[in-house]
Amino acid sequence: MSTKEQSVILLRKAALAMMAFEWIQVAMGSVSISSVLVLACVIVIPFPFYAALLWPIKRLASAAKIRKVVFWCLAFRAFMPIIGNVFANELLRIAPQVAVGVIAIILIINFTPDKFAIKFGFAQKWLFIPAIVLFYMAGFVPPSIHQTAVSSEEYSDDSPNIVLLSWDTVRADVLSLYGGTGLDTPNLDKFASRSVVFNDAVAHTPITGPEHSLMLSGLLPPSNGLRANVVSKMPDSVVTLPEMLSGKGYATGGFVSAYPMLGRFGFQQGFSVYNDIMGNQPLIRFKQLSPREIFWAGLLYPFLRASTKAFTSGPVVQERAIEWLNQQNREQPYFMFLHLYDAHAPYTPSPQFEKIALERIHSATPAAFDGNDAESMARYRAEIAMLDSFFGELLIEIEKRDPGLANTLIILTSDHGECFGEGGIHFNHVPSLFEATQHIPLVIHFPKDAGAGMRVNETVTHLDILPTCMFATGDDLESLPQDVATYPLQLAYSKRGMGYDMRGVYLEAQQTTLGDDRLRGWRTAEHKYLISRSGQEQLFDYRTNEVENKLSKEPKLAVDIKATLLNFFNALPILDGSVLSISAQDERAMGDLGYTD
């Protein structure tokens, strides 16, 4: 057998081995696997694999050439995650062609008859390098960017652009808009002067996933199937706000910054682009990559795991959103959902903001409920000051497309607040239904500055976001999904008020890790009634304080509010979400975010 014939056989075997190994890695990455298996896959296997793969070439090439081949293969593999991040958008567009090219190369190398392979030079060593290049390009596409083709109707010329901006974990009372001191938010204050400020906006839950599912579906968590972070998925049967807007011809983009907001929990529904890649730097994406993608650079995996994050900093997420926005047709209306997580613990503000906040630690109001939490609350304020600086930059980009915001609806809110000693809860929110977590900011800019400077005292909730957006596109309320009464917030300026005197609000804290401490509650104009899964009851005059449990002093009032709560809950349509198994990665990510048992 000639040397050329031998090279054909050896290269085919090498390519076949490469393909088989990659498919094993794909299969392993698609199921829940132990960390031991992952380490074996990404560290132990590559050495014999590359030795077996390159040995035939070493036998047929000079030492100088083999070093080049080895260097190319290893360098390409090590830098693959970085390249995948940098060129994510471009690679997404060509992913199908790349996949076809990979298959074609493998088929050519492995199944071309010998005489044709030898005649046309398929056995040449240079073919091996592009084969590796194409094959590994299949692993470039970040798996966490969801792109969906959404059928749509023709949009109306006067359809407004819609921006939903969520500042995670921002309680209302620390903002100057709501009476707080010691925190400068000049961009928010200027924005509020041309917007409508809602003084009594209330979150239904203190948990990131459920409250955002509520914003995007217009349904309470019991009715949309997502009542806790990570453990369940909002079913596809739930029609979401981006799905409705897509049906009206809107471009829809979602950009989120924390693990509970991953698309796999149902949040990507209706978005043409949903970017939920976690981490600021390319290497941080290791936690999101499959073993197939990191099997060579996996040498660093044990060291990187400790430093990886389950969230992404605000500037990175906002930059992704702005990049998407600038790619959209200026004639087409858009819906952009932007979720920023910076105010969530752990509090790590930029030094310039931290310095100012710490200087005001004793004068800022409200003070931390527990004095020992004062320094943490100061850093929390510094994080919010950072968010305000990001907001100023975002508004500039939005106004480039719509000068004066003549045709743009912008909703700025938060999913919940944070406790600094309230109820014995520190730097957390999950077990709380206190005002520290449930009273949240809500500021809405309506097109052409309608209602600018108004302040609305009536109680509103995140359930009103969906009808507000759809009402802006011309829909009437009867066509919208509702499990309880909701209101388009345009009523605030069109009728100089919301049109109701008092609105009771259903509350719940149902994260599964709370066990028997899971809560349901009802908030009236003056009182708040809470009952735990174990049956423990509390009644607060929350306008005055939430320290004294008035259950024994006002038992009849407690009975009446409890009856209202139970009647309301029993009338709700209940939808069970898809139950998800909790992986080791889920547990690590939630631990990184402070969600521990």
List PLM regions with ranges.
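Catalytic domains that recognize anionic headgroups
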Residues: S2-D597
